[in-house]
């Protein structure tokens, strides 16, 4: 019964983590930027980001913990080790975004009064674009790794 509960918690954490990322990345953010002005959309997304990243941290810690617990209970194998390592890398990606990237993005954004008034070659705009690109890349990598984790999980599940 303990194994069933661990599997349930593991599956729920992965579903909420990857599902939340997919929803925000492919549905919410594009719609927000389509409907609102760039300034307003940026403010909405900036308000969502702390919650978005905390969801990733909480779900990542739970997924990592339950994956380790399942490995201990069911004996480690190559796929379970790979899955657990990938989850750890995903969690590191989220933590990197929270601890390193987001403070830098916020610091640059605080210096920008309006994106509309900034020239395309303005150093602040270029720095914001560079940081945004790095943040996008980390987010995409975490999402893609999450899909790999989901595949490994589906491949190793016993019904």
Model-found features: residue ranges?
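Polytopic transmembrane helical bundles with strong interfacial aromatic enrichment
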Residues: 1-159
């Amino acid at each position: 019964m303990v194994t069933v509960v661990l599997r349930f918690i593991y599956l729920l954490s992965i579903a909420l983590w990857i599902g939340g990322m997919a929803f925000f990345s492919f549905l919410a953010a594009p719609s927000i930027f389509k409907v609102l002005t760039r300034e307003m959309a940026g403010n909405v997304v900036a308000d969502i980001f702390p919650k978005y990243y905390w969801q990733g941290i909480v779900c990542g810690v739970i997924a990592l913990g339950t994956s380790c617990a399942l490995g201990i209970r069911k004996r480690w194998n190559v796929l379970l080790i790979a899955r657990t390592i990938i989850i750890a890398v995903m969690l590191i990606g989220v933590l990197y975004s929270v601890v390193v990237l987001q403070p830098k993005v916020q610091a640059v954004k605080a210096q920008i009064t309006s994106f509309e008034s900034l020239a395309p070659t303005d150093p602040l705009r270029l720095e914001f674009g560079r940081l945004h690109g790095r943040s996008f890349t980390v987010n995409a990598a975490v999402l893609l790794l999450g899909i790999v984790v989901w595949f490994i999980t589906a491949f190793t599940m016993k019904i």
